[in-house]
């Protein structure tokens, strides 16, 4: 039994050495630099389009704060309410000479209770759009 455990430990150590060697090879190679550069590009690109949605329940009703990224400020904002689900879609079209780009992002959140879109009130404060659903209109 002891012989079998020694072999198992020896194999685990060899596997760790091989894994570390492969990681070192890829991290220090041109391929590793390419992967890291691509990951940094994706992360920095997504930072500009991230949005947050905060739901606050108060005695007067339901408040939903939606942070709109600066990249979408001139675009289209579509809010759709279905029962207990809020769907927010941000869209922006940009035209440069002979080419056009279209960026779109959708977020969906489940609300604490059912609301009706026709009761929705909206307001703006800098980069935050606030939706309000009065309590007396959904009960």
From Swiss-Prot:
Record's signal peptide: 1-32
Q: Which UniProt keywords apply?
A: Signal
Cysteines engaged in disulfide bonds, as pairs: none
Superkingdom: Bacteria
Under the heading CDD domains, the entry gives:
ACD_sHsps_p23-like
The record's annotation in SUPFAM superfamilies points to: HSP20-like chaperones
Q: Does the record bear Signal in its keywords?
A: yes
Q: Where is the sHSP domain?
A: 44-139
PROSITE patterns per the UniProt record, alphabetical: SHSP
Protein family (similarity comment): Belongs to the small heat shock protein (HSP20) family.
Q: What is this protein called?
A: Uncharacterized protein YpqA
Recorded name of the encoding gene: ypqA
């Amino acid at each position: 039994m002891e012989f079998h455990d020694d072999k198992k430990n020896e194999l685990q150590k060899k596997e760790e050495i091989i894994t570390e060697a492969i990681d070192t090879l890829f991290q220090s190679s041109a391929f590793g630099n390419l992967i890291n550069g691509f990951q940094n590009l994706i992360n920095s690109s997504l930072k500009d389009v991230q949005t947050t949605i905060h739901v606050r329940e108060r005695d007067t009703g339901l408040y939903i704060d939606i942070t709109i990224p600066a990249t979408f400020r001139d675009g289209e904002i579509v809010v759709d309410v279905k029962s207990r689900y809020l769907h927010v879609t941000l869209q922006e079209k940009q035209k440069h000479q002979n080419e056009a780009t279209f960026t779109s992002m959708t977020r969906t959140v489940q609300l604490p209770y059912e609301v009706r879109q026709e009761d929705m009130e909206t307001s703006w404060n800098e980069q935050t759009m606030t939706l309000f659903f009065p309590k007396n209109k959904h009960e």
